[in-house]
Amino acid sequence: MAERRRHKKRIQEVGEPSKEEKAVAKYLRFNCPTKSTNMMGHRVDYFIASKAVDCLLDSKWAKAKKGEEALFTTRESVVDYCNRLLKKQFFHRALKVMKMKYDKDIKKEKDKGKAESGKEEDKKSKKENIKDEKTKKEKEKKKDGEKEDSKKEETPGTPKKKETKKKFKLEPHDDQVFLDGNEVYVWIYDPVHFKTFVMGLILVIAVIAATLFPLWPAEMRVGVYYLSVGAGCFVASILLLAVARCILFLIIWLITGGRHHFWFLPNLTADVGFIDSFRPLYTHEYKGPKADLKKDEKSETKKQQKSDSEEKSDSEKKEDEEGKVGPGNHGTEGLGGERHSDTDSDRREDDRSQHSSGNGNDFEMITKEELEQQTDGDCEEEEEEENDGETPKSSHEKS
C-alpha cells in the first residue's frame, strides 16, 4: 500500500505530458534508430542515448522560428529535455548484461568435442589410406592443378567466417537518469504509426464492402467475377509451369543419364520477388564424369602442341632458306672485294650490296654485280693487251 501511494505521488508531481513533449517523443520514437531484444521475458525496443541526441539536434525543434528561440541549441539542452521525458515514463534506462554459459552447457560442449575428436581420428586414418592410393595419380593432376589455380584466381575469394556476436540481455537500471553516451534506454511509449492506421482502415472498409457484395450493381459484380476468374487462371498457369518444369528436368536427366541438369525458370518457386522469379529463363549444368573432361583437355593440348610444332617447322624452313641465300651473297661480295680492293668505287658497291641484302633484294643485286664484274674484267683485259702492245714498240725505239 505504501509503495502504491508513493507511485501516485510521483505521478502527480511529474504531471501529464504536454502536446509538445508528445510530439518530440513521437518524432524520436519513429526516427531514432532502434533495435529489439528480450527483457524480463518480453520483446522490447531500445535505443542508444548518443543517437537520440543527434536525432533531436537534426529535428525542426533545433531551428529557430520567427520570434521564438530554438528548443534544442546544444547537446546539454537535449539531455535535459530527455530527462524530462524519462521522468514522464516515455522510456527508462536499462543495463546490458552478457549471457553466461551454464555448467551444463559447458559439459555438453566438452562431450561433443570428445566425440568429434574420435570421429576425426577415424577420418584421418581413412584419409591416409586413400592418400597412398592417390600418390600415383598426383603426377597427372599437376597439369590440371595449374589450370584450376588460374581459375581460382579469377573467381571471387571464399567467404569469410561470420563473426559470432555476443548475446546479451537487458535488465532495469537502478539509477534512472539520461546520460549522453552509449547508455541503453528501452521504449515504453508506443504510439500507433500513421501508416498502420491507414492500412487498418483500408482493411476494415474492404471487409465491409465484401459483405455488401449482393447489393453491388450488376456491372460491378460481373467485373469482379471476370477478375476473379483471371486471377484463378493466372495461379493455375503458375502451378502448371512448376509441374511442367519438373517433368522437363526429369526427361532430360533420364535421357542423358544424369549428366545434364536443365531447369526452366529456376527461380519460379524460390523466395524472391515476382519479377525475379522469372529470371533467368533457364539454367544448364553438366555433371558428367571427370574422365570425359580429361580426354577433352588432353585432345585440346595435343592440338595446341601440333599447331606449335607446325609453326616451329615453318619458321625453321624460312631460316634455312635465308641461310642458303646469305652465303651466296657473301661469296660474291668476297670475290668482288679481292678483285677490286684497291679502288674506292668497288668498296662503295660492296656497302650497297650489303645494305640491299638486309632489305631482302639479294637476288637483284647479285645479277647487277655479276654484270659489273664482267664489264670490269673485259676492261682490264683490254688494258693489259694495250700495255703488251706498247712494250715492244718502246723496245724497238730504244734499239
UniProtKB/Swiss-Prot annotation:
Signal peptide: none annotated. Pfam families: Sec62. It is found in: Endoplasmic reticulum membrane. GO terms for cellular component: endoplasmic reticulum membrane; rough endoplasmic reticulum. GO terms for biological process: post-translational protein targeting to membrane, translocation. Residues 108-155, 289-324, 336-354, 390-399 have a biased composition (Basic and acidic residues). PANTHER family: TRANSLOCATION PROTEIN SEC62 (PTHR12443:SF9). Mediates post-translational transport of precursor polypeptides across endoplasmic reticulum (ER). Proposed to act as a targeting receptor for small presecretory proteins containing short and apolar signal peptides. Targets and properly positions newly synthesized presecretory proteins into the SEC61 channel-forming translocon complex, triggering channel opening for polypeptide translocation to the ER lumen. This is Translocation protein SEC62. It comes from Pongo abelii (Sumatran orangutan). The lineage of its organism: Eukaryota, Metazoa, Chordata, Craniata, Vertebrata.
